[in-house]
Amino acid sequence: FESADYILFYGESPHIWNYDASNGLFNHQTHLFADEVNYFLTIDNQQDGKRVETKQALQNATKIVTSFNEFSFHETENENLIHSGKEWFGERFDTQNSQSFDFNFPNLDQLSPVSIKTTVVARSLVPSVFTVSANSSLLNTISVDNIVTTYATEYAKTASKMTNYNASSSNVTITIDYSSSDNGASAWLDYIEINARRALKMSGSAM
C-alpha cells in the first residue's frame, strides 16, 4: 500500500431516507444522536484479500433508464425549546424574519416537478404565517395556530406543507418569511426536504 494509494468503499450516513409508497416520495429521518458513522479497517496479512469478480455484460436490455431520484434536506439541530426531550429545531425567526437556503441538483430533469416539503414551528399568542418561495416564486403559505398559555399545553405549534415546483434551473433557493402580529412571537425552521429527478449524466470529475 503506497502513500498515494487510497481506499474507496460504500458508506451509509446515520441519516436515512425511507420510501413512502403512498405518494412515491422519500422522507428523511435524522439520527437523534450522531452526525457521522465510524468504520474500522482490519488488515490480515495471513490471507489473500477479496477480489471483485468479472461479470458478463447483460444483453438486450428491456428498460432504458435516463434519470434517477435525488433528494436533499436542510435540518440543523440548534435549539431545544423546552430543554428536554428529543425535539431540536434550527434557524430562528424573530429578529431575522426572512432567511434563504440554497440547494443544487446538477442536470436537473426539468420535465419532472420538484417536491418541496417545509416543516416549521412557531410560538405566538395569535395565529401566524410562514411564506415559502422557490427562486422568488411563491410556493405556499403555512398557517400556524396560536399557543394557549394554560398549564400542560404545547410550548409551540408545528405545521408542515408540501408543494410541487417546476424548476427551470439546477439551483433552487428556498426563501422563508415569517409574520405574526404578536411582537413577542418566535419561530423556527424544523426542516426543508426536497425530492427531485436528475438526468443520468456524470457531473464532476472521474475517480
Positions of predicted regions on the chain:
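Structured catalytic cores of large enzymes
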Residues: F1-M207
